[in-house]
Amino acid sequence: MAKSKDVRVTITLECISCDRNNSDKRFPGVSRYTTRKNQRNTPTRLELKKFCPYCSEHTIHRELKK
């Protein structure tokens, strides 16, 4: 039997420092990651520190609104 409601949803994480100061960088663009989260355990918006290839450092990536 399949469950009626899926608890895990697919989300997109976006770098918060790329869009602000991207004019002096080598490559234009915004770093994005896709992942899944459990809505029951994490009802708030997710923030993770991930590597951004455009900034060439580890930065905070925030969950995008759907």
UniProtKB/Swiss-Prot annotation:
Signal peptide (UniProt feature, chain positions): none
Bilayer-crossing regions: none
GO (cellular component) term, any one: ribonucleoprotein complex
InterPro entries: Ribosomal_bL33, Ribosomal_bL33_CS, Ribosomal_bL33_sf, Ribosomal_zn-bd
Keyword Ribosomal protein found: yes
Keywords associated with the record: Chloroplast, Plastid, Ribonucleoprotein, Ribosomal protein
Coiled-coil ranges (or none): none
One biological process term in Gene Ontology: translation
Keyword set includes Transmembrane helix: no
MF terms in GO: structural constituent of ribosome
Cellular location(s): Plastid, Chloroplast
Family according to the record: Belongs to the bacterial ribosomal protein bL33 family.
UniProt-listed PANTHER family: 50S RIBOSOMAL PROTEIN L33, CHLOROPLASTIC, LARGE RIBOSOMAL SUBUNIT PROTEIN BL33C
Protein name: Large ribosomal subunit protein bL33c
Source taxonomy: Eukaryota, Viridiplantae, Streptophyta, Embryophyta, Tracheophyta
